[in-house]
């Protein structure tokens, strides 16, 4: 049962439930004791000149069903949560049942994962069964953000290339899946200088990747880029140690528009990948990490 703001609401709901059950029982008893009238046994209402409503008591089988329903409700509310904040004698919760089912499923799958957990990513990438399991894990847990083809979208990284903010080794990928990542670029406008300086730095950043830019503005922004170099490096190639982006390639996680660069410098950006350790076992993460690693390796081989 969901938590209430205070115990008063719990008592209120529980009271209504108990009163309703008692009311049903009283109505059933009163209706069952009604006797058939000796004369015409009608309610006295007449429709269409001669259509009358009989006033017979409830059939015994129907009254029996009502009694069974009330008894079931009493037993259910005693065993399971449903009477206000009362947890029931079985202390059952849907969360607990789900956790138990997950543990049971993991125990059943443990022998299957046991043969994979000691293998490196290179070996798993060549194992069709391991890759099939990894693909299903990806579809259930990763595709919602990164896409069914793992190519991502604006704000969600493409996992099939070799542009890794935090590293693309199997161990780094597992680390990312397990603990998640928080990418945080603070607003830098104040550190860069004037609004014109922000525009110039944006032009310089565009020039690093060979994107269309204003050459004069880019040269003016080069000196101001020094405040960005603390994270992105003096050459703009980024640093995986802090998860900063490589500004010299043609991969732009949040888009390439010039105005977009202005916004990033002015407002900063926070991107979060949630941790999956609570959803996946270490063995599952090992296989899933190998599958994700294989996606970029396939892309690299194809590019060659």
Swiss-Prot record:
Cellular component (GO) terms are:
plasma membrane
Describe the protein's quaternary organization and the partners it interacts with. Component of the cbb3-type cytochrome c oxidase at least composed of CcoN, CcoO, CcoQ and CcoP.
State the PANTHER family in the record: CBB3-TYPE CYTOCHROME C OXIDASE SUBUNIT FIXP
UniProt-annotated binding residues for heme c 1: 142, 145-146, 273
Q: How is the cofactor bound?
A: Binds 2 heme C groups per subunit.
Cofactor(s) this protein requires: heme c
**Where is this protein chiefly located?**
membrane
Q: Which organism is it from?
A: Rubrivivax gelatinosus (Rhodocyclus gelatinosus)
Annotated Cytochrome c domain residues: 129-209, 216-296
Query: So where does this one cross the membrane?
Result: 11-31, 61-81
Protein name (Swiss-Prot/TrEMBL) = Cbb3-type cytochrome c oxidase subunit CcoP
Provide the GO biological process annotations.
Answer: oxidative phosphorylation; proton transmembrane transport
Binding of heme c 2: at which residues? 185, 228, 231-232
Q: Which GO-annotated molecular functions does the record name?
A: electron transfer activity; heme binding; iron ion binding; oxidoreductase activity
